[in-house]
């Protein structure tokens, strides 16, 4: 809304064109296409729009810090991409002349050859030396105009110029004076330029859309929250203060949750805030220094204009506070008229029909308001905030065409309120404005900020019987007019809680219906989600006896054939390493060394993917064997060789089984010569590649996916766009890393690891250790410089990642990727909370579609669309923290628990769950979700008949303890069960496969070192014997309770069985005997 405050669209931040050799350059392809459009338009509309001009003279004034819009600057930016201040351009039928400084001429050199080759136009540079007035160069241009005109048979030359732009600066004043004395005829070409700029190309349309997105995001995410905060807390805020706050949000888009580069955005005009009876709907309006007024019958008008790549957008809204009936009626009529005007912006219609559509609505619904309606319904918008010639009024008969953009602005000026209780609010105005794009079909609204009555009208009055005000108005005298409760302190909280309860009740009804439908259609019932074991090839070390090596009679390790040769009864007997469960060695006081080998027997498979040891269960198996020797060196060497070989074979078999379950994906299409792939360098990857020495790599965005690679040929990962379920960009704020994270639909292999989450990150701070040893002062210059360098490095890395993410987002907007619905999501830190999703505390942050924790490994990514309900457990008075159980729609999936969430985060989490339409319950105890879900899937009809999930809604009744355990002694996970024999043994072997190398060795030494049967096996035998005799002793109950403590905080939902093998094989009884 700037008319007198016209704003120059400057591409370089300094407002001057870039110098040769720097990062700025002219887009030659863009120049050719638009120069061709200029000449074609000039030729086609020479008589009616260009005044039959033989030449077009465009003089751009020097740069200015004032916010202004000029046709000459607009032509510069439209044609060349930048504004060229203090420059003269002259277009003739066969030549383009530039009169400018040397630096500008060197930048313009790149257009000479393409213009001649493709447009048959000669580009001629007239370089003005410093200190010269340029008169000689101007005479040369005049001669060229006359020569070309004589060649066409014209004696008199007509020169088109922009009549409204007065000359500024010495060069332009000299030019104007000499041009007038050159005996040319002059015509105004403003209409021709306006019509040329009216229809946008695809690049311009995208810039207008991004500008509109920024404008309405600032309105929605900055303006409205600040207004509500000021009203809610009864703050004294001036219009100018709100203007400054809003302007900063436009110039720093991240404050409005918009991912646009700050250097590409600007304001169209200083944001406008008006209230208190003083309103001006003209584009030149300004925010004054008076306080924002929000008394009853108050009107607040807010207008925001934003630019992206110099293209403008606008949005304006009116907010009503305890509106009177007249104000409500006037707004409803204005809203209908505004929507009618937008709907009338159809290709082929005349512009005056748009204004007539709005006027007809007012005449029909409120004829008394007709004389108060603004005389214009807006203007065209683009490089200029107000494109002359495209005013939406009753006289403009120009025809609408696709890809025209309009600022549809309509209002009522100086209406009078029937209530005279407040003279300040007696007069009021209303205004609505939106940026709209004309298309081949219906118009496209670009500023999608709500303007419905329910979203802009605020009511703070209590019912008539409760009309005693709780608080006096800030500006009231002896009378009390305001009784606000909808956004005021205690009453506001109660109202908000009631609304949330109502919404949760509706969600409960919907969720029960949805669950009933899903269970009714689920024929699988309580099927097991675990995959069946895969049988690999038979474990055979040697096909016949002749293949065995002939060595001396001692324990040997044949690495090539993966066999261990044991001397038994005078012969070497081969055992495949896959048959060995553990090996250990120790030494007694007599220097005798013992090597003890325990083999796999039926019921304890080599790994979870192999079932060979389940074959021939009726045969006799060797359980364990021990050897004694005096050679300690050989003993330790053999033990280590067997462990190493077993570990290698185990890893290979595990990787082979994992790869067999992978989903086949398409090939990555590398970027060819058409475009250079987007690239981020010096990144680290998680999960990392195997190997001791890690090296950074490069992430590239190709035609259909990403490729991460290092200098090592075997370290390469391809992530296809089609396999990405969620993409996240998390800049470093309070963390040490900036990251890009991809959560995938199907697993991929990263080195030898199978994963659904791949992350690429950079550490934003270098670890520096001072060798001086002394403590530095807080004001030490070196310390300050170092901190500044760290801040600069962090900001640069964040900017690089942000640029990469934005470029990829633009790529994902292409039609071929539209079905994937991909966009980099950014975590919302203000909604985050601390909790323990795995083993350590982490900061968990919601995004628009997920709940994530991307810093600590293992990562947490939960899709909100997959959540059935959330149960908040151990919620009660006096508790410092509580637990959050997330139940998924797939009941075969283990429940995810986030433990030890601070109680201070409870209200925020409940509010977030409610706003994302997730049903939540609260309970005082932890529930046994494995048993609950098993009961539901076993008998879904009973679950539905009993009211579905409403069994959780027991208001803290202790009857919940049917599936729970007491938690008054502090947190103990209640869903850890005493596992059956088969589960115990399976998880035992699984933990061996999935644990790290060091953990595995420790586990073997601690759990298998001095026993044949494990302690679990011995205890189970004793327990079974007791059960056969009908005995269940108190000590057994005590052992169960202690065993759960021994498991620590592991849960079936996260670890698949809980604990490592060393924990499983060390029950309380063993600790007690030690």
Swiss-Prot record:
Segments forming a coiled coil: 493-520, 637-658, 782-802
Ranges where the record places region Disordered: 1-21, 505-534, 954-1074
Protein keywords: Chromosome, Coiled coil, DNA damage, DNA repair, DNA replication, Nucleus, Transcription, Transcription regulation
Biological processes per GO annotation: DNA repair; DNA replication; vegetative to reproductive phase transition of meristem
Location(s) in or outside the cell: Nucleus; Chromosome
GO-annotated cellular components: euchromatin; FACT complex; nucleolus; nucleus
Biased composition (Basic and acidic residues): 505-520, 1010-1032
SUPFAM superfamilies found in the cross-reference section: Creatinase/aminopeptidase
UniProt keyword Coiled coil present: yes
Biased composition (Acidic residues): 974-1009
Biased composition (Low complexity): 955-964
Chain's role: Component of the FACT complex, a general chromatin factor that acts to reorganize nucleosomes. The FACT complex is involved in multiple processes that require DNA as a template such as mRNA elongation, DNA replication and DNA repair. During transcription elongation the FACT complex acts as a histone chaperone that both destabilizes and restores nucleosomal structure.
UniProt record similarity statement: Belongs to the peptidase M24 family. SPT16 subfamily.
Subunit and partners: Component of the FACT complex, a stable heterodimer of SPT16 and SSRP.
Protein name: FACT complex subunit SPT16
Organism: Arabidopsis thaliana (Mouse-ear cress)
Native organism taxonomy: Eukaryota, Viridiplantae, Streptophyta, Embryophyta, Tracheophyta
């Amino acid at each position: 809304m700037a008319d007198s405050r016209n704003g120059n669209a400057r591409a370089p931040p300094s407002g001057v064109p870039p110098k040769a050799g720097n990062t700025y350059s002219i887009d030659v392809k863009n120049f050719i296409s638009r120069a061709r459009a200029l000449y074609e338009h000039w030729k086609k509309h020479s008589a009616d729009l260009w005044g039959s001009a033989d030449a077009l003279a465009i003089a751009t004034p020097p740069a200015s810090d004032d916010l202004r819009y000029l046709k000459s600057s607009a032509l510069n930016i439209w044609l060349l991409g930048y504004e060229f201040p203090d420059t003269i351009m002259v277009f003739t039928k066969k030549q383009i002349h530039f009169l400018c400084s040397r630096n500008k001429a060197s930048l313009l050199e790149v257009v000479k050859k393409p213009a001649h080759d493709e447009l048959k136009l000669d580009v001629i540079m007239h370089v003005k030396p410093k200190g010269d007035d340029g008169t000689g160069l101007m005479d040369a241009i005049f001669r060229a105009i006359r020569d070309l005109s004589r060649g066409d048979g014209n004696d008199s030359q007509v020169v088109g110029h922009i009549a409204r732009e007065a000359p500024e600066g010495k060069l332009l004043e000299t030019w104007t004076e000499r041009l007038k004395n050159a005996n040319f005829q002059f015509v105004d070409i403003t209409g021709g330029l306006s019509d040329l700029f009216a229809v946008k190309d695809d690049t311009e349309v995208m810039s207008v859309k991004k500008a509109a997105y920024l404008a309405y995001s600032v309105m929605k995410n900055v303006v409205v929250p600040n207004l509500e905060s000021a009203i809610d807390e009864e703050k004294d805020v001036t219009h100018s203060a709100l203007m400054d706050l809003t302007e900063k949000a436009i110039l720093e888009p991240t404050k409005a949750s918009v991912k646009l580069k700050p250097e590409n955005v600007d304001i169209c005009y200083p944001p406008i805030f008006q209230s208190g009876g003083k309103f001006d709907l003209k584009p030149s309006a300004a925010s004054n220094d008076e306080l924002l007024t929000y008394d009853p019958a108050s009107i607040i008008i807010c207008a925001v204009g934003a630019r992206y790549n110099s293209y403008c957008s606008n949005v304006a809204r009116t907010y009503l506070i305890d509106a009177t009936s007249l104000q409500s009626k006037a707004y409803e009529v204005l809203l209908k008229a505004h929507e009618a005007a937008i709907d009338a912006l159809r290709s082929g219609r005349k512009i005056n029909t748009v204004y007539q559509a709005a006027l007809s609505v007012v005449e029909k619904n409120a004829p008394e308001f007709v004389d108060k309606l603004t005389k214009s319904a807006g203007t065209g918008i683009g490089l200029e905030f107000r494109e002359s010639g495209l005013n939406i009024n009753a006289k403009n008969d120009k025809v609408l065409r696709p890809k025209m953009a309009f600022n549809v602005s309509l209002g009522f000026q100086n209406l009078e309120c029937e209530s005279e209780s407040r003279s300040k609010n007696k007069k009021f105005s209303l205004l609505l404005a939106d940026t709209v794009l004309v298309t081949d079909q219906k118009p496209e609204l670009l500023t999608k900020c709500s303007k419905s009555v329910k979203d802009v009208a605020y009511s703070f009055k209590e019912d008539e019987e409760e009309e005693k005000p709780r608080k006096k108005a800030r500006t009231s005298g002896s009378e009390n007019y305001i009784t606000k409760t909808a956004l005021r302190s205690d009453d506001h909280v109660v109202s908000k809680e009631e609304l949330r309860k109502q919404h949760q009740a509706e969600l409960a009804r919907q969720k029960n219906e949805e669950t009933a439908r899903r269970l009714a259609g689920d024929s699988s019932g309580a099927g097991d989600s675990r995959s069946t074991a895969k049988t690999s090839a038979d474990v055979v070390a040697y096909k016949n006896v002749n293949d065995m090596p002939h060595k001396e009679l001692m324990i040997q390790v044949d690495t090539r054939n993966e066999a261990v040769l044991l001397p038994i009864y005078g012969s070497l007997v081969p055992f495949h390493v896959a048959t060995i469960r553990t090996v250990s060695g120790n030494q007694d006081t007599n220097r005798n060394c013992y090597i003890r080998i325990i083999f796999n027997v039926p019921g304890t498979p080599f790994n979870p993917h192999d079932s060979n040891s389940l074959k021939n269960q009726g045969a006799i198996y060797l359980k364990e064997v021990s050897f004694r020797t005096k050679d300690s060196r050989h003993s330790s060497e053999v033990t280590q060789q067997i462990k190493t070989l077993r570990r290698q074979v185990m890893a290979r078999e595990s990787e082979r089984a994992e790869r067999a379950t992978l989903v086949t994906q398409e090939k990555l299409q590398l970027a060819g010569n058409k475009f250079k792939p987007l690239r981020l360098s010096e990144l680290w990857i998680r999960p990392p590649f195997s190997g001791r020495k890690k090296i950074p790599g490069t992430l590239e965005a190709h035609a259909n996916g990403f490729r991460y690679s290092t200098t090592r040929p075997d370290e390469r990962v391809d992530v296809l766009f089609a396999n990405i379920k969620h993409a996240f960009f998390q800049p470093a704020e309070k963390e040490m890393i900036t990251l890009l994270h991809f959560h995938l639909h199907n697993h991929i292999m990263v080195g030898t690891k199978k994963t659904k989450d791949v992350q690429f990150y950079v550490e934003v701070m270098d670890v520096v250790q001072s060798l001086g040893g002394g403590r530095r002062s807080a004001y030490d210059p070196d310390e300050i410089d170092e901190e500044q360098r760290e801040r600069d490095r962090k900001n640069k890395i964040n900017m690089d990642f942000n640029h990469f993410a934005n470029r990829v987002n633009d790529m994902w907007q292409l039609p071929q990727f539209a079905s994937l619905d991909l966009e980099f999501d950014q975590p919302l830190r203000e909604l985050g909370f601390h909790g323990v999703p795995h083993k350590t505390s982490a900061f968990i942050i919601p995004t628009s579609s997920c709940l994530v924790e991307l810093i600590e490994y293992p990562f947490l990514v939960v899709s909100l669309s997959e959540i059935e309900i959330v149960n908040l457990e151990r919620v009660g008075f006096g508790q410092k923290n509580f637990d959050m159980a997330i139940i998924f729609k797939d009941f075969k999936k283990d429940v995810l628990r986030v433990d030890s969430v601070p109680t201070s985060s409870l209200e925020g989490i409940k509010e977030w769950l409610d706003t994302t339409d997730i049903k939540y319950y609260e309970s005082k105890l932890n529930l046994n979700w494995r048993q609950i879900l098993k009961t539901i899937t076993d008998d879904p009809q009973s679950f539905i008949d009993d009211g579905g999930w409403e069994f959780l809604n027991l208001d803290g009744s202790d009857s919940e303890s049917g599936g729970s355990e007491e938690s008054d002694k502090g947190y103990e996970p209640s869903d850890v069960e005493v596992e059956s024999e088969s589960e115990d043994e399976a998880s035992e072997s699984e933990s061996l496969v999935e644990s790290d190398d060091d953990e595995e060795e420790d586990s073997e030494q601690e759990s298998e070192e001095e026993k044949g049967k494990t302690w679990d096996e011995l205890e189970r035998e004793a327990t079974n014997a007791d059960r056969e005799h009908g005995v269940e002793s108190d000590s057994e109950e005590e052992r169960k309770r202690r065993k759960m403590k021994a498991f620590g905080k592991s849960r079936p939902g996260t670890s698949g069985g809980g604990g490592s093998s060393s924990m499983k094989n060390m029950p309380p009884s063993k600790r007690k005997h030690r």
